[in-house]
Amino acid sequence: MSTSSPFRVASKIVTAGCLCLPLFQRVLSDLSCEENEMCVNYDERYPDGWYIWFFLLIFLVVLLCGVVLFCLQCWLKRCGINPPRRTMAVFAVGDLDPVYGAEMAGSPTSGICHPTQNTELCSAPCFGALGPPPPYEEILKAN
């Protein structure tokens, strides 16, 4: 009969606690006190094992930061923030209108395009020598 994952994790936590308990008892115990000697109260002297509590505190802070970062990563992955943006160039050509180009940057999921400035697009004089485009019927005959 197999146990589920939460019970395995709980048993590992209990095992780790049982292994760490003697370490903490040793830090908190007064080892310098013998049977015939007068013992010094633990609260009246500086503990020798302060660094263990310091490392335990650092470990807990790192563990907390790791859990927060893991949850943040899962949340960002689920929300799908920052979808890849695509650029689309639109050129409008008409008999009476000058030739101009506009570049739109839009998101594929939102369908909203935002005009952007692009200096690489040719200006109207660049296309002025070509003349108007051929009629639709001539294009069909050429194919």
From Swiss-Prot:
It is a single-pass type I membrane protein. The chain crosses the membrane at residues 52-72. One of its GO terms (cellular component) is membrane. InterPro entries: TMEM207. It comes from the Eukaryota. Coiled coil: none annotated. Keywords: Membrane, Signal, Transmembrane, Transmembrane helix. Its main location: membrane. Residues 1-29 form the signal peptide. The keyword Transmembrane applies. It is found in: Membrane. Interacts with WWOX. This is Transmembrane protein 207. It comes from Mus musculus. The gene is Tmem207.
